[in-house]
Amino acid sequence: NLCVFATTGIALSGSLITFFVFYELLTLSTWPLVVHKGDRKSIAAGRTYLIYTMIGSAALLFGIVWLEGITGPVEFANDPALDELSRLSLTVIFVLCIGGLGVKAAMVPFHGWLPQAMAAPAPVSALLHAVAVVKAGAFGIVRFIYDVYGIERVSELSLGPPLAIVASITIIYGSLRALQQTDIKRRLAFSTVSQVSYIALGASLAGPFATIGGLVHLVHQGLMKITLFFAAGALAERRGITSVDQMVGAGRRMPLTMLAFSIGALGMIGIPPIAGFVSKWYLGIGAVQGGYTWVLLVLAGSSLLNAAYFLPLLYRAWFMAPVASDEPTSAGEGPADLIAPALVTALASLAVGLFAGFALSPL
C-alpha cells in the first residue's frame, strides 16, 4: 500500500529532504482516495485537498531550501550549523516550515480541506484523520522542533508560546465548529481539527511531560478516532445513519457498534481509564511545570465542548427508543468484518489507558 509506505518513510526519515519526499508521496497517494466516488462533491473535495496541501508543501519546501542553502543538508539531529543563521532568518524559516506542516495537521486557519474531505468513504476518512495525513503534519511539527531546531533554540527565539497559542485556538475552534455540525462525519472531522492540535501544543510547551503527552496523543487519538470512523461507517452502511437526529435508538439496534463508538467518544472527552485521559493528564502536568497554567483552561474547555458534542449522540443512541416506522428491514449488527475492526480498536483504546505506565507498556 503506497500510503503505508509513504507514512513509514516519514517516520523513518533521517533528514529534512527525505522527510519532504515521503511527505509529498503521501499527499499524492491519498488524493485518489478522496476523489474515489467520482461525483461532483468528491472531485471538489479532492481539488480543495490538493490546493491546501500543495500550498503548505510549497511553504515547507521554501523553508527547507533556504535552510539547506545556507547550512548544507540538515539531518534530524539538532544541527549546530543552524547557529550560522541570523535570528530573523531562523524565525522566518520556522514560520514557513511549521506553517507548511500545519496545513496537513489541519491547524487554524489551514484546516478547511479536512471537513470537505469527508466526501470520501468512512475507511478513507479514518486513514486521513487517524493514521496518516493529519498525523504526518503533527509528527513533522514535533520532529522539526526537537530534531532540527532543538528546544533550547526554540526557547531562545521565543517561538514556543506563539505556536502554543495557535494550537490552543485550533483546539477550541475545532470543538466549537464540531458542536454546530449535524452530519456525524463532519462532526468527527472538526473534532479531528481540535484533537490533532494537542500534539502541536505538547511540542510547543517544550517540557518532558508535555512532550510525552503530545506524543502519546499521537497514538491515542489515532486509536479513538479510527474507532469512531469505523463505527460511523458501520452505522451508515447497515442502518443509513449519517446525521445526529438519526442516532435515536441506535444503541438498541446495533449495541456492539455503539459500544465501540461510545468508548471512542468518551475517550475523546477524556474520561478515565480510556486512552484520551492519559495524554490530557500528561499535557496538563507539562503545562503547569512549564508555567503555562492557562493551558489548563484550554484543556478543560476543550473537554467540556467534547462532552457537549459527543454526549447528545450517546444519549440519543442509548436512552431514546427507536421509532418503529423508522426500523429498516435488515436487522442486527451485520457481518463480523464490519463490526470487528471497531471493536478491536475500541478495546485497544481502553487497554492503553488501563495499562499506561506499566513496565511493559510502550505508552
Model region roles, listed by residue range:
Residues 24:
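Short phosphate-coordinating micro-motif centered on Lys-Gly-acidic
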Residues 2-19, 28-281, 285-317:
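Hydrophobic transmembrane alpha-helices and their helix-loop junctions in integral membrane proteins
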